[in-house]
Amino acid sequence: MNSPQRLSTYWVTCADGLETLLQQELQGLGIEQTERFAGRLIFQGSLEQAYRVCMWSRLASRVLKPIHTFELERTHDARDVAEELYEGALSFDWSLIFAPQSTFAIRLHVEREIKVNSQFATLRVKDGVVDSFMEAVGRRPSIDTKQPEITLFVLAGKTEHTYCLDLSGDSLHKRGYRHYMTDAPIKENLAAAILQKAKLTELKPDLILDPMCGSGTFIIESLMIFTDRAPGLVRRFGFNGWHGHDRELWLELKAEAAERHEIALQNTLPKFYAFDADWEAVKATRQNIIAAGFEKLLDQIQIEERTLADWPSFENTYNTAFVVTNPPYGERLGDKASNRALYLGLSALLQQYFPKQHAAVIAAQIEQADVLAFSEPETLRLMNGKLPIYIRLGQVKPVANSQPFLANWHADPVEIEGAQDFANRLQKNMSALKKWAVKDQVFCLRLYDADLPDFNVAVDLYGDRLHVQEYAPPKTIDPEKAKKRFNLALAAIRAVTGLPREAIFIKTRARQEGKNQYTKQSTASKRFIVQEGQAKILVNLTDYLDTGLFLDHRQIRLRIAQEARGKHFLNLFSYTSTASLHAALGGAASTTSVDLSNTYINWSKENFVLNGLTVDHADEQHMFFASDCFEWLKEGHEQYDLIFIDPPTFSNSKKFYGTFDIQRDHVSLLKRAMNRLSAEGTLYFSNNYRGFELDEEIDAIFYAQEITNDTIGPDFKRNQKIHRAWKIQHPHMN
């Protein structure tokens, strides 16, 4: 292999955006000088160097050897490009390149400015090659578009057409191991490029994780890198039928590559983890790993069906970790909001399990990548086929503050003229709630609820932000006086909590009836994540009077989380389905959420996706219905072990059949729901109507136990009428 060889020109093509990385890779293969173009590098080199690129390049798409250039005499608009391509092919003696008994295929690439029917032009190139053979040797080769022995790559340009021998045959991204496919896969060479951009070999991780592994491409490409496995070692190439092929040289290069791989297999490898929520993807990953020749390494690769909500603890399992994944964006997941929730949830998991470790995540839109909590992030834009993708790489930021806001709050003296009583009461409430909030890790709670008649507001804490609701004053109160008092309250709130103005969101709340209870307040959507128990929940303090999380039902949701394991759970009037979310995270066998509003059903799905749970999935474990709850109960027959009903006081929605009044209609609602409750099941019923009384008929036919006191948290003890709640079971249970 050390004998001098004649230098030739070679083109190495790649996906747009990979030129710099490919240039670095070629330098590592001993090719120092390259000319760079969009999607292509050109070098002058030996056949051995071209073979090495075929064997070792993890990033290239094709290796082309220009054979013939046909210069054009005319370039005006009326040119017949297809005929030019025919003439160019005919003008060269192709019998010098391959034998007539060989099969061949044509790949045509036309520069953007040129207008021509590509299919017809490809046929004319084929005609030119065939006619050239007939003139030269009196025989013609056959076409084989599936597995040709020779592939000719033709570039149709403005001033010339270039005819190349494609040494690659098939595109180099086809390593030969992907026998099983999943939706929206990443090409093998793009996966390798991401690993190279992440400087995987320099990181030297002892743990590599792909939590949404699809067909296992990242895991397999990582294995190939760490075992020094040449990507071209076991695949077919396009030079075997070429007259200029040096078979002895190629076999020497193959032997060298095989030896390097065998030596590297003796090295200590990282531990590999491949998870996916789809069992078909798990099977595909396992089969593709075997097809890639790594069956003996399966004991070092943990391949499991897992959702993001079901990650194992990685504590004390690594010193340096690397996480890389291609989430199911776009085609596999659906709407943009759910996509954003998926990336938010993934980011939170990375912060929880892999702080300060490196990660690389693919996104379909840059907005998805922007929610990832990486320090000093890098972004790589590539083309995966015809789809642009963004790769965000960086070091995972640690969680800024994992403790409730009250844990670090202190009751410092404040003076607010005109609102001192209010400031004192707010401070007293916060001091009283602090111990409980820290002990039970409560991040969202009510701090004040019209405790003083002159300050008729509710103050709710969501993480490190405040939601302040001003109850509409009676008509007898001077509006200017009410406005002044409210502004004093805001000043006191800021002084007591220490939170800046931008962390305080203000609403005016009147008694809500019917459709007005969900009136949108503004056009800007500013959802953010809060924690409740195991659940991460999206709340919105700007767009609606309600935030997406009813704080007074916290204790019921946590009770459901404790009781849901292995049970089938039904949530009627589910709103944003936070109770369903708690049930799912608590191990429910299934959850079903029903609400009339498409808006809240979509919000519900985002909450599930945020927590790594699958929605709209083949196994239908978590189902959502935008439907009238009465009609839905009437139409189905499925039985549930645990049911939660938290209906509105009143509704006259256009989607509703008539009107709904909780006092008038609760008997028929509960009867229908109890028909869907399993024999040993439990139904929790709650509502916020202050004058509500449970009808005696319910007590007569079911076992109904009022549990209101058990469902009101310490932050609502000052308002015992915030809601009423019952535990209802079939009579034989007691």
Swiss-Prot record:
GO terms for cellular component: cytoplasm. Residues 49-167 form the THUMP domain. It holds the Pfam family THUMP. It is an enzyme of class 2 (transferase). Its EC number is 2.1.1.173, 2.1.1.264. It is found in: Cytoplasm. GO terms for molecular function: 23S rRNA (guanine(2445)-N(2))-methyltransferase activity; RNA binding; rRNA (guanine-N7-)-methyltransferase activity. SMART domains: THUMP. The keyword rRNA processing applies. Its main location: cytoplasm. Keywords: Cytoplasm, Methyltransferase, RNA-binding, rRNA processing, S-adenosyl-L-methionine, Transferase. SUPFAM superfamilies: S-adenosyl-L-methionine-dependent methyltransferases. InterPro entries: 23SrRNA_methyltr_KL, DNA_methylase_N6_adenine_CS, RlmKL-like_Mtase, RlmKL-like_Mtase_CS, RlmL_1st, SAM-dep_methyl-trfase, SAM-dependent_MTases_sf, THUMP_dom. It catalyses: guanosine(2445) in 23S rRNA + S-adenosyl-L-methionine = N(2)-methylguanosine(2445) in 23S rRNA + S-adenosyl-L-homocysteine + H(+); guanosine(2069) in 23S rRNA + S-adenosyl-L-methionine = N(2)-methylguanosine(2069) in 23S rRNA + S-adenosyl-L-homocysteine + H(+). Specifically methylates the guanine in position 2445 (m2G2445) and the guanine in position 2069 (m7G2069) of 23S rRNA. PANTHER family: RIBOSOMAL RNA LARGE SUBUNIT METHYLTRANSFERASE K/L, RIBOSOMAL RNA LARGE SUBUNIT METHYLTRANSFERASE K_L. Belongs to the methyltransferase superfamily. RlmKL family. This is Ribosomal RNA large subunit methyltransferase K/L. It comes from Acinetobacter baylyi (strain ATCC 33305 / BD413 / ADP1).
